[in-house]
């Protein structure tokens, strides 16, 4: 009993937080393979362009999109997870709710995106506690891009968007596993992004109403799921304004296709 009391009643002034975290087994780093050049070793195992006999083939696909307009930001994604030619799941949540004001999307390797965006969430919370204010989307995106750049060449697979509001207002950024960081008003990432862009480019404008923006995002994902075998399942729809993000629902792709066929006279090649 005395040992328990002493452990949890010591003054924190002399405690080293980093040491405590490492002793408890928690860390925001991961170990690399103990070989002379870890990046080359991992690339040889995962990069099919460098080694056609590679043991780990990172085949994946998805469709995610986000865009800014006059009333905020819309984020929309599908829910299919693929493992090469196989459908691993139809109910994957590809929007990571980092905090009530910031969302991250998932494209590429699910584990990489989930792990590092969880780490980002901890960093954002620490910033808020230290500075008594929300972190800006720009600063959050810079943290994530610095992390991914530090592991460039080590086999990470990430193509994520960060959308949110904070100090500096609403903003949208694209970050990938090479450390690339781009600010923009419209992005679509994943194997189905070409099809999503086809709808977005024809319907996007800055002065969209909120309902028009939500429908455009939803309709773009539907088009991508129809043409891209690696996208499908259902559509998850979010909206962000100065008060934070709001989840607008999960919608079945098949139902949305039939709805578009009836209301727009589109998908005419699909027989009843």
UniProtKB/Swiss-Prot annotation:
Chief localisation class: cytoplasm
Pro-peptide positions on chain: 1-61
Superkingdom in the source lineage: Eukaryota
GO cellular component: cytosol; nuclear envelope; nucleus; proteasome core complex, beta-subunit complex
EC class: hydrolase
Catalytic reactions of this protein: Cleavage of peptide bonds with very broad specificity
Any Gene Ontology biological process: proteasome-mediated ubiquitin-dependent protein catabolic process
Function (record text): The proteasome is a multicatalytic proteinase complex which is characterized by its ability to cleave peptides with Arg, Phe, Tyr, Leu, and Glu adjacent to the leaving group at neutral or slightly basic pH. The proteasome has an ATP-dependent proteolytic activity.
Protein name: Probable proteasome subunit beta type-5
Species whose genome carries this gene: Schizosaccharomyces pombe (strain 972 / ATCC 24843) (Fission yeast)
């Amino acid at each position: 009993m005395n040992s328990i009391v002493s452990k949890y009643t010591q003054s924190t002034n002399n405690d080293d937080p980093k040491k405590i975290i490492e002793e408890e087994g928690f860390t925001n780093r991961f170990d690399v393979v103990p070989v002379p050049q870890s990046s080359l070793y991992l690339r040889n195992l995962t990069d099919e362009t460098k080694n056609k006999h590679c043991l780990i083939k990172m085949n994946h696909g998805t469709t995610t999109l986000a865009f800014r307009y006059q009333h905020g930001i819309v984020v929309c994604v599908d829910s299919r997870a693929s493992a090469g030619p196989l459908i691993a799941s139809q109910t994957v949540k590809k929007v990571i709710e980092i905090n009530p004001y910031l969302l991250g999307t998932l494209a590429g390797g699910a584990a990489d995106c989930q792990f590092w965006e969880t780490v980002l969430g901890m960093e954002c919370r620490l910033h808020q506690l230290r500075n008594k204010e929300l972190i800006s989307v720009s600063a959050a995106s810079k943290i994530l891009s610095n992390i991914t750049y530090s592991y460039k060449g080590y086999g990470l697979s990430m193509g994520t968007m960060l959308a949110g509001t904070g100090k500096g207002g609403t903003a949208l950024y694209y970050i990938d596993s090479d450390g690339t960081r781009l600010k923009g008003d419209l992005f679509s990432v994943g194997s189905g992004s070409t099809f999503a862009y086809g709808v977005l480019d024809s319907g996007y404008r800055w002065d969209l109403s909120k309902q028009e923006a939500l429908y455009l995002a939803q309709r773009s994902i539907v088009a991508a799921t129809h043409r891209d075998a690696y996208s499908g399942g259902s559509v998850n729809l979010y909206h962000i304004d100065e008060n934070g993000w709001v989840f607008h629902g999960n919608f079945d792709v098949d139902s949305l296709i039939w709805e578009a066929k009836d209301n727009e006279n589109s998908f005419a090649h699909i027989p009843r």
